[in-house]
Amino acid sequence: FKVIVNEEAKAGETILNKAKVDDTVNPPEEPEVPITPEEPITPRVKEGKLTATKTVNNAKPKLGEAIEYTISFRNTIENGVLNKVVITDQLPKGLTYVKDSLTSVGDEPKPTSLTEANGTITAEYPSITDTKERSIRFKVIVNEEAKAGETILNKAKVDDTVNPPEEPEVPITPEEPITPRVK
């Protein structure tokens, strides 16, 4: 007989097929298939599909104010695999990274690498085999290169080397700081 390996099979995990032979007189036998252990059924890896978003906690910050970005991604295919996911975000002119503000949020596996160097944020995740959302968060200060009323577009790149990379972006429009009036 033939079988179809269905959606419940996990890529890379062996499936053991057991049969029961019972003549209702003698004790039943339970032969295991495959008989030769070197021939287990191992489902092929099903490719995952990547989706990513980027948000900011304040789209109209004052000049000199700190804001927080969140870059999130997930695999949208049940039992699919994203091999290695790399998030990069080159901060545009007008934004300065806040030291030690970079964190990851979400279930295991956590990023194997989470760094900031010269205004570039990088997070590397190992193989992702579920559909749970994972995120990185970091703060920036709207610096003196930003101009009030001019939009700053911050774009990230989320790549798993198989699917076309996602490039989520979010604009902010800095505003003049409130200056106290002297009475």
Each model region followed by its residue ranges:
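Exported/extracytosolic protein signature
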Residues: 1-183
